[in-house]
UniProtKB/Swiss-Prot annotation:
The lineage of its organism: Bacteria, Bacillati, Mycoplasmatota, Mollicutes, Acholeplasmatales. The gene is alaS. Its EC number is 6.1.1.7. It comes from Aster yellows witches'-broom phytoplasma (strain AYWB). Zn(2+) binds at H534, H538, C639, H643. Catalyzes the attachment of alanine to tRNA(Ala) in a two-step reaction: alanine is first activated by ATP to form Ala-AMP and then transferred to the acceptor end of tRNA(Ala). Also edits incorrectly charged Ser-tRNA(Ala) and Gly-tRNA(Ala) via its editing domain. This is Alanine--tRNA ligase. Pfam families: DHHA1, tRNA-synt_2c, tRNA_SAD. Belongs to the class-II aminoacyl-tRNA synthetase family. Keywords: Aminoacyl-tRNA synthetase, ATP-binding, Cytoplasm, Ligase, Metal-binding, Nucleotide-binding, Protein biosynthesis, RNA-binding, tRNA-binding, Zinc.
Length: 864
């Protein structure tokens, strides 16, 4: 049975039991700031289990993509550890409970119509106090010797829903391990008894202060189950490990072909296959390889896989070449991979190239931090923390070079850093405790700023930091949109903050008392411009996704009065031509003059009308209602910000700048409406200043015979094209100026050589002193000196180049040490200088000391 058939059978079975089929959620969690990845089938459904949301369906089944990297070091060493895996699940939210859940599991696993496992191959664990579960399994015909009670079969992760669980194991026989069910009882790592399914009966409210038997029963009981697809495939396909199933083996075969090495269970093959799947699925879901959080996890996986490739002789980037076989292996169930295949490969190639550059410098950096063939714990930590060299790579270098490392000290320093991080988190917690007054303030305050810019209102609360109004037109700094500016009874509001329970805190200099009536008004002009920029941000995002791909996700934004800023992920630099096309398409949307519609919907209505949208907005925190901003269907998004009423209000859109702010993250700054020309002029000002300086320099170099052509700047287009034009124009002028400088230099050199007799003494000796007072570029003087030195086969040439405010001394020699001569002489002239034996330079601003220097040199050279 193929993995595709296993998934389909699971879904088909539970659909026949009236379960709603839930599509796999993104690997990037929603509403889980402290969770890097979706790591279990229940993770995206927790909102239903904790009562935060009421599900539309009480019975749910799914095949959920998951990532866990906690046991990364075990991947490849064991048969079943993976960083990416698929969890098959069935869930009941206040519907069926123990008996039905156990019956469903029994039927699906043992019925010839479904998986058809021999009953005698199944072993079941249950919580030692849970006699109901024991009896249900017994009634279904499970041998009581195959029923194992365990004290630890109880699921709880702190206060909240908890309950006993029952685990189902498949016995693969004595050939995998001669020991028997003690392997299960003692929880020993083995390849004989494979845990294939865990069913959690969520029936109690966990109270850490009480023993389990004292827990209160939940009014609504739930079922949460999870079965590992990879493990089921291993059993149903009768393979030795998960890695020989069709979920990994096509990749391993591709690696065999690439390396010309036969797979016999090598760890490197397994690690590469596992990590590559994780990378492909994570990137497909919008994750970015960075130096922080989940991005760092992915970068670590990529580098670990790349290192394993080197063990197989793959010295050049290779992971990107394995994307097509990965997609081919998984596309039957995950069709979206096909759309992003090329993008994923490009991301991996880019990151592999970056890693190669890191490796080239890493070993050199490693060697620089050694002391007597030893790497101290301090330097180990420095290489890891400051230079970003992976721990395993440092250890590999040490092993290869036979270097002793103070690994224990490194770990101590690492723990210190982690503890400091925890301490900082504690400080933040303490700070939050100090805001207890905010947390306990529950009086509602109405925001009327979507439609009103001013209102008469009343002060309902006075804090040390500011006041809360009964109703307010002020928008706080939220969702990337900056706060409003304005006044309360002619008092300038300095800061607007949203309190924990949703009210708006207004900070300013002044005194008000509770119950006092006031007049609040915002800066209407600035608010409108902010709203236009917010709508423009939505349009920009849509066009970016159209032009670059659906993998584009917002990584940060700032919607202000003077401009907007949008940060996004992408795997390569965007060309100027593409940026111009993006700008053009945003303007085309603006010129369509379509209304911006706002919908306030209940969660239930929003799920019916915009289900896909809600799934895409992984970080949205839904309450009773959601606000949808709909711009003629080409841009539909959840948004609490203020917007234009029609795209025509934006008038015009101009990109001001584009830059890379970190690996794989780019930033566009743009502007719309009447701000366009003013903002563009401000951006062009530095270029204009640079162009002016270039022009002035060129004019200063011009001679009677040589003239520099100053090209006219192209006409202003009120577009990013102006930025591009200026950049190109300056680059062209810079290149032309370099050539002109060379031409001017050659002109002066030629003229000076033609007039060399004007600078030479009447009699040419092997030791010569020259003084030049005619103003020339120093490069010309040096060229002339070198010309004279070799033309007349001199032993020593000392040249004084006298300028109004300084003197430059040059010495070229075949006999005495030029550097020593200059160094000793300029000290007498209150100057400085030096050089090597054959060439030296010095100088002084004390021009009156010229004679002292010349007399010193004459004596040294013995010139009369």
């Amino acid at each position: 049975m193929t993995s595709f058939e296993i998934r389909q059978m699971w879904i088909k079975f539970f659909a026949s039991k009236n379960h709603h089929i839930e599509k796999s959620f993104s690997l990037i969690p929603r509403n889980e700031d402290n969770l890097l990845w979706v790591n279990a089938g229940i993770t995206p459904l927790k909102k239903y289990f904790d009562g935060t949301q009421t599900p539309s369906f009480r019975r749910i089944t799914n095949v959920q993509k998951c990532i866990r990297t906690k046991d990364i070091k075990n991947v490849g060493k064991t048969s079943r550890h993976h960083t990416f895996f698929e969890m098959l699940g069935n869930f009941s939210i206040g519907n069926y409970f123990k008996k039905e859940a156990i019956h469903y599991a029994f039927e699906l696993l043992t019925s010839p119509k479904w998986f058809g496992f021999p009953l005698e191959k199944l072993y079941i664990t249950y919580f030692f106090q849970d006699q109901d579960t024991y009896q249900y399994w017994l009634d279904l015909g499970v041998n009581k010797n195959h029923l194992i009670h365990l004290k630890d079969n109880f699921w709880q992760i702190g206060p909240g829903p908890s309950g006993p669980c029952t685990e189902i194991f498949f016995d693969r026989g004595k050939t995998f391990d001669p020991r028997n069910k003690e392997l299960i009882i003692e929880d020993l790592e083995n390849d004989r008894f494979i845990e294939i399914w865990n069913i959690v009966f969520s029936q109690y409210n966990c109270d850490p202060k009480l023993p389990i038997e004292k827990y209160q029963e939940l009014p609504s009981k739930n079922i949460d189950t999870g079965a590992g697809l990879e493990r089921l495939a291993c059993i149903l396909q009768n393979t030795k490990t998960n890695f020989e199933t069709d979920l990994f083996f096509p990749l391993i075969k591709a690696l065999e072909k690439m390396t010309q090495i036969t797979y016999t269970g090598q760890e490197s093959f397994k690690i590469i296959a596992d990590h590559l799947k994780t990378l492909v699925f994570a990137i497909n879901d919008g994750a970015v390889l960075t130096n922080e959080k989940r991005g760092y996890v992915l970068k670590k996986l990529l580098r670990r896989a790349a290192n394993e490739g080197k063990k197989l002789g793959l010295e050049k980037p290779f992971l990107y070449k394995l994307v097509p076989p990965t997609v081919a292996m998984m596309k039957d169930f995950y069709k979206e991979l096909c759309t992003n295949q090329e993008m994923i490969a490009k991301v991996l190639l880019q990151q592999e190239n970056i890693f190669e550059k890191t490796l080239k410098t890493a070993e050199k950096t490693f060697l620089q931090h050694l002391t007597q063939n030893t790497l101290s714990g301090k330097n180990f930590f420095k290489l890891y923390d400051t230079y970003g060299i992976p721990e395993n790579l440092i250890l590999d270098y040490a092993k290869k070079k036979n270097i002793t490392t103070d690994y224990q000290k490194f770990q101590e320093l690492l723990h210190e850093q982690q503890n400091l991080s925890k301490k900082n988190q504690t400080s933040q917690t303490n700070m939050n405790k100090q805001e207890e007054a905010f947390l306990h303030f529950l009086t509602p305050s109405e925001f009327i700023g979507y439609t009103n810019f001013a209102c008469k209102t009343k002060v309902i609360k006075v804090f040390d930091e500011g006041i809360v109004l009964e109703k307010t037109p002020f928008y706080a700094n939220m969702g990337g949109q900056i706060e409003d500016e304005g006044w309360i009874d002619n008092n300038k509001v300095t800061k607007i903050t949203k309190l924990p329970n949703g009210q708006i805190l207004h900070e300013f200099k002044g005194n008000f008392c509770e119950g006092q009536e006031v007049y609040a008004c915002i800066d209407k002009t600035k608010r409108k411009q902010i709203s236009y920029h917010h709508t423009a941000t939505h349009l920009l995002e849509v066009v970016l996704q159209k032009q670059l791909g659906n993998h584009i996700k917002k990584q940060g934004s700032s919607v202000g009065f003077s401009s907007l800023r949008y940060d996004f992920n992408h795997f390569e630099k965007i060309t100027p031509q593409t940026l111009l096309q993006i700008e053009k398409e945003v303007n085309q949307l603006i010129q369509k003059r379509v209304p911006v519609k706002i919908e306030q919907l209940s969660i239930q209505d929003a799920q019916k009308k915009y289900a896909t949208l809600l799934e895409q907005n992984q970080k949205a925190k839904y309450k009773d209602k959601v606000r949808i901003v709909n711009i003629d269907t080409f841009s539909v998004d959840l948004c609490g910000g203020t917007h234009a009423t029609n795209t025509k209000d934006l008038e015009h859109f101009t990109i001001l700048s584009y830059e890379s702010i970190s690996s794989g993250i780019y930033r566009i700054e743009a502007v719309c409406n009447k701000n366009c020309q003013e903002s563009l002029n401000a951006k062009l000002a530095p270029y204009q200043n640079e162009l002016h300086q270039l022009t002035q320099k060129a004019k200063s170099l011009q001679t009677q015979n040589l003239d520099f052509e100053i090209k006219k700047f192209p006409p202003i287009t009120k577009s990013y094209q102006d930025i591009i034009n200026y950049q190109k124009h300056i680059k062209t002028q810079q290149q032309a100026l370099v050539l002109f400088e060379k031409k001017v230099l050659e002109h002066h050199q030629k003229k000076m050589i033609q007039a060399e007799s004007n600078f030479l003494p009447p009699q040419i000796n092997k030791k010569m002193m020259l003084t030049i007072k005619e103003e020339k570029p120093l490069e010309v003087i040096k060229f002339f000196m070198n010309h004279i030195f070799y033309k007349y086969h001199l032993e020593v040439l000392f040249l004084s180049y006298v300028q109004p405010e300084k003197i430059v001394f040059l010495c070229q020699s075949k006999t005495l040490h030029a550097g020593n001569l200059i160094k000793e002489g300029v000290s007498l002239a209150c100057g400085s200088g030096g050089g090597n034996a054959s060439l030296a330079q010095g100088g002084t601003k004390k021009t009156q000391n010229l004679e002292k220097m010349l007399n010193f040199v004459k004596n040294k050279l013995k010139i009369n």
